[in-house]
């Protein structure tokens, strides 16, 4: 099949597509005009001529008929130009032509043929439409045949070359003549040849098979020579010569038919497969393909191919690459070092919003806690005191200051007593941990505890408390150094935080509990009054604040 004629010529009928066909208002061609038979086509001529005659007429008909060759065979004139007279007496003469008929599969000494009968109506219709019809053939009625006849023709192959009408094919009636399926059925046992017909005369073969009639002159392997080679007076020796010539041409046709594009591609593919890999002694195949690194096409790097053999592949001739000079390599290295040393410039965060407030939770500053604690303005002075750079601060190293003081108002008598404690130091510490109470008491000054005492009260976190007790004749003053405490005085409750001060009057019940998450520290001072203090409530004490005034 010629694929270059797709859409131009019918594959099966051989009808050419009409180019100048009138179209209707919808730009559509008339289907009758589109498939109208071309009178000048070779297939239509052969079809019409084939329908007019059965190709093999009897030697004698019923008295009034005459042996006349079909019109399409009258062109083959014999060399002896033998004149045949009509029995009717009209004097119409015709030259008898020799018909070359050779069967492709077998030869018999005497070829006996029985004419194929056709219906009179169909024959008459075909005769009316045929331009080659003769008056004699038009008068023929339905023939009745009395005997069979045989024909023999000599074939001279020495002078002119033979002309091949149709390609070789198997004349087996069981062969499926239509286009085979691409996938054969499993239950199809009667399949001999499922290959597509790709010969040059496939169109003509399909036409002849569709008509259901295969003329003897068009059987596969028949050849027709020029007019000069036809000889009606040939004997059996000429038949044998023609058979030998036919076999030689048949072998040549088989070679030409098989030598198609598919076979050529298969041969080339086998050559490529055998050379594209190396098989070692273990049977492993190693590819010989050339591996090329990715090319920089922007630098005009490319692979140049060239055909070095008859194989259907191209071989690599050369690979064009770009080589950087030493100066360029040094420049690139310097640029890399510069990028590494360059500090990143401060830029806006990826979540920057024009409102000025970034999205999401801000990052925690590790130095935030240190900034919350205010710096001690006396830090430098404390360092100088601890180092001994300032006078009157040496006792802090010992923790307790004991000095000589007066002990009487009337007498000039002095005595050494403890008058100061360093931070986190006390004279004694008492801890009480029971079911109802949990606290610690640091006593600092208690030499005259029947009148006066002072110290620090500590309440542990969560569970620290001092149960409800009576103050009797003692006044107690507390200053909260750390934490949060809940104070109960008589029937009153209140909270005290860091830096606050509260007092417990005499003759009242009081209780203290820790309500914070850390330890609570309170400095206290207590003073005990005499028993007759209630009698002197109305008297004025002139010396109460004389020491601060």
From Swiss-Prot:
DNA-binding region: 356-364
Primary location: nucleus
PTM sites of type Phosphoserine: 325
Name of protein: Inner kinetochore subunit MIF2
Residue stretches of biased makeup (Basic residues): 335-345
Quaternary structure (record): Component of the inner kinetochore constitutive centromere-associated network (CCAN) (also known as central kinetochore CTF19 complex in yeast), which is composed of at least AME1, CHL4, CNN1, CTF3, CTF19, IML3, MCM16, MCM21, MCM22, MHF1, MHF2, MIF2, NKP1, NKP2, OKP1 and WIP1. Interacts with CBF1.
Region (Disordered) location: 47-275, 335-374
Pfam family, one: Mif2_N
Composition bias, Basic and acidic residues: 263-275
Task of the protein: Component of the kinetochore, a multiprotein complex that assembles on centromeric DNA and attaches chromosomes to spindle microtubules, mediating chromosome segregation and sister chromatid segregation during meiosis and mitosis. Component of the inner kinetochore constitutive centromere-associated network (CCAN), which serves as a structural platform for outer kinetochore assembly.
GO molecular function: centromeric DNA binding; protein-containing complex binding
Gene3D superfamilies (alphabetical): Jelly Rolls
Source species: Saccharomyces cerevisiae (strain ATCC 204508 / S288c)
Residue spans of biased composition, Polar residues class: 56-65, 96-108, 151-163
Keywords: Cell cycle, Cell division, Centromere, Chromosome, DNA-binding, Kinetochore, Mitosis, Nucleus, Phosphoprotein, Repeat
Lineage: Eukaryota, Fungi, Dikarya, Ascomycota, Saccharomycotina
Amino acid composition bias (Acidic residues), ranges on this chain: 114-124, 203-225, 238-262
Localization per record: Nucleus; Chromosome, Centromere; Chromosome, Centromere, Kinetochore
